[in-house]
Regions:
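Short cysteine-rich clusters marking metal-coordination/redox-active sites
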Residues: 14-17, 33-36, 74
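Thiol-based oxidoreductase modules, predominantly thioredoxin-like and allied folds used
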Residues: 46, 66, 78-104, 111
């Protein structure tokens, strides 16, 4: 991991006390407000050079948003994803990947349409959702993905 990746930070306003906090893209555990100590929404951007450090090695489940600047549905679903990250502060990390800036990641994860959402658990894809959806649908999908066993723990039907 380069020093640039380790030093990259996002400013997040605490939904509990309103204090602005600098949250690193890469860290162990979950970010907490420096003022009130509540868990903060963890939202980061990643590209080809730092995706492994930011998303695949995260200590909590990661909701990955593959999006593009020219994509209308991507812009429509972005506030819903940020809402989910806020609702599940300390439980998930939201990582946004611009497919035009990271085409190799799009190929690697077989992204054929944007937006496409993935849930990574232990660095493995646990769930996939293509296309925009209302926040209630995304919330249910995310909750299902978070409650299922890890891909490596899934048992074959008998």
């Amino acid at each position: 991991m380069t020093a640039d990746v380790a030093a990259r930070r996002t400013v997040v306003t605490c939904p509990h006390c309103g204090k602005r906090n600098r949250v690193p893209s890469v860290a162990d555990g979950v970010p907490r407000c420096g003022n009130c100590r509540h868990s903060l929404p963890w939202i980061a951007e990643a590209g080809e050079d730092d995706f492994a450090a930011v998303a695949e090695r995260a200590s909590i489940p990661v909701l990955v948003d593959f999006w593009a600047t020219w994509c209308g549905p991507c812009r429509m679903v972005s506030p819903a994803l940020e809402q989910l990250a806020t609702e599940r502060a300390g439980v998930i990390k939201l990582v946004k990947v611009d497919v035009d800036r990271a085409p190799a990641l799009g190929q690697r994860f077989q992204i054929q349409a944007v937006p496409t959402l993935l849930v990574l658990r232990g660095g493995e894809v646990a769930a996939r959702q293509a296309g925009a959806a209302p926040v209630a649908v995304l919330r249910r999908w995310l909750d299902d993905a978070l409650t299922e066993s890890k891909p490596s723990e899934k048992k074959e039907p008998s």
